[in-house]
Amino acid sequence: MYKEPFQPTYEYALECDKHDELKDFQTEFYKKEGTIYLDGNSLGLLSKRAEKSLLTLLDSWKEYGIDGWTEGEHPWFFLSEKLGELTAPLIGALPEETIVTGSTTTNIHQVIATFYEPKGIRTKILADELTFPSDIYALQSQIRLKGLDPDEHLVRVKSRDGRTLSEDDIIQAMTDDIALILLPSVLYRSGQILDMKRLTAEAHKRGIHIGFDLCHSIGSIPHHFKEWDVDFAIWCNYKYLNAGPGGVAGLYVNKKHFNRPPGLSGWFSSRKDKQFDMEHTLTAADHAGAYQIGTPHVLSTAPLIGSLEIFKDAGIERLREKSLHITRYMLNLIDHELKDFGFTIGNPFEDEKRGGHIYLEHAEAARICKALKANGVIPDFRAPNGVRLAPVALYNTYEEVWQSVMILKKIMKDEEYKQFENKREVVA
């Protein structure tokens, strides 16, 4: 259990660390000495187990050559399905409904090509104006491929405050001309969690298929897809799941849709026992593997093997418990220490609406992020004025949170940020 109630002292942070049930996992990760890493919502840290599984698959290539597809500790031919099974508990899905494959954007193209069937008056896709740009680019592309105009057929729900979305507004936008819905589970800037259960139920009442982009929720919050009856989902594995830069992504398709042919077919859509028959008629797999396209990217998949072992040991419910407590602690500390320095807290305070990161707004956000980095704290800048800070349950400590807020306070008090330009780097 975590120490209550909140106190702004250094001693309180140490007490919270002492009572942290997940503290033993911190030694699993490579943490640079003298650095406080608060960017795990953008790229998670390397774990020793992920490193080991990557080296194991490199060794299997070295030892087996082509036979690595079927030999060794982790045969490559079955790896996507195996890791899909291990991922399924994180989203509350059946093992056969989950596959590890492709990238987030290619998987968006796959699910939209599979589920978007404009007919009659139902020709539009419903999204939102705060979602990640790649989702919008893919949706626009898929609409054009149907010979339609994205300006007319892509509906984006407006935000009332520029940070969050109202579920009531989303439901109101589920009109008779909507053919498909794709929404984020957690908004990438503000960290707001959308009520996926409610939105799915409302979409289904209207006969609309609905899916979610889980990039900022998987590995951070529990999901219950079997209960919620979500139609499809996609995600990356390199944020909270620590699969490494450019690591393989994931895809979920509700089993009730397994009779739906993949919109984008490829060799690895095949049933495994038929794949090497080399027929020109596809015999699709009878599970989520049917929605793979090409050959698995084995080496970018390898770190996920070790990472998912850690998640199995830690448990997503325990991770969420700590995440809620440490983000609430950070919010309280920011409110206590930084209220005179022009920051606006942009993420929800309510536990049920708050994802795994803190979102601060400030007119000098870009240069503040640079000053934090110069002081050994790794944040994340999001244009135009956002600072994201992610105290990750697996490897961040309460002491690090306390130290980072005190460093930020000193930066603001001494105006250290003014020595930097207030514009983002090429990679923010």
Curated annotation (Swiss-Prot):
Instruction: Supply the SUPFAM superfamilies for this chain.
Output: PLP-dependent transferases
Could you tell me which residues carry N6-(pyridoxal phosphate)lysine? K239
User: Which class of enzymes does this protein belong to?
Assistant: hydrolase
The UniProt keywords, alphabetically, are: Hydrolase, Pyridine nucleotide biosynthesis, Pyridoxal phosphate
GO terms under biological process: anthranilate metabolic process; L-kynurenine catabolic process; L-tryptophan catabolic process to kynurenine; NAD biosynthetic process; quinolinate biosynthetic process
The reaction(s) this protein catalyses: L-kynurenine + H2O = anthranilate + L-alanine + H(+); 3-hydroxy-L-kynurenine + H2O = 3-hydroxyanthranilate + L-alanine + H(+)
Where along the chain is pyridoxal 5'-phosphate bound? T104, T105, F132, P133, S134, D135, D213, H216, Y238, W267, T295
In alphabetical order, the GO MF annotations are: kynureninase activity; pyridoxal phosphate binding
Q: How does it assemble?
A: Homodimer.
The UniProt similarity line reads:
Belongs to the kynureninase family.
Protein name, entry field: Kynureninase
Q: Which organism is it from?
A: Bacillus cereus (strain ZK / E33L)
Q: State the gene name recorded for this protein.
A: kynU
